[in-house]
Amino acid sequence: MSRYRGPRLKKIRRLGALPGLTRKTPKSGSNLKNKFHSGKKEQYRIRLQEKQKLRFHYGLTERQLLRYVHIAGKAKRSTGQVLLQLLEMRLDNILFRLGMASTIPGARQLVNHRHILVNGRIVNIPSFRCKPRDIITTKDNQRSKGLVQTLMASSDPGKLPKHLTIDTLEYKGLVNKILDRKWVGLKINELLVVEY
């Protein structure tokens, strides 16, 4: 299956708020779940919805998500915890969390158009896995800095997770450590995704 490029608000109404997909939030009165689906939820449906939340929030294809679940399953720690850490340490997600992009698809575009440097080298792969002590900057040209400047000025520094630090004057971000579970920006039960 390919990456989803359709109407984002339909997905938000069905699955709930997905901050990585769009800044908009669903209205409380327009909840499709309450209008059409009453009664008991089946376990399969609950697990599928959790998986779809994860997929649409991080902008993954089905194959990419399966690959991440497989890698997390090989780890000695909790599979769900490792899965979220792998997804949160992707370059496109870190740009979104730093406030350099308004959404994860916007961060993917910045990376694909070669505006981002990691440790002084151009990286054009959005799924690049960042490590602790990686320094993420924009290119030195005016166009790259201009794209990021307006977004960083409007972002809230209080929402910055503890595993990241940002220098707004130099348009530079630093990955301090691996993410803790409590700083994940999405309300999700990752164990249901692993079970699916």
UniProtKB/Swiss-Prot annotation:
Coiled-coil blocks: none
One cellular-component annotation, GO: chloroplast
NCBIfam families associated with the record: PRK05327.1, rpsD_bact
Source organism (scientific name): Festuca pratensis (Meadow fescue)
GO MF: rRNA binding; structural constituent of ribosome
Stored CDD domains: S4 (cd00165)
Gene: rps4
Record's protein name: Small ribosomal subunit protein uS4c
Pfam (any one): Ribosomal_S4
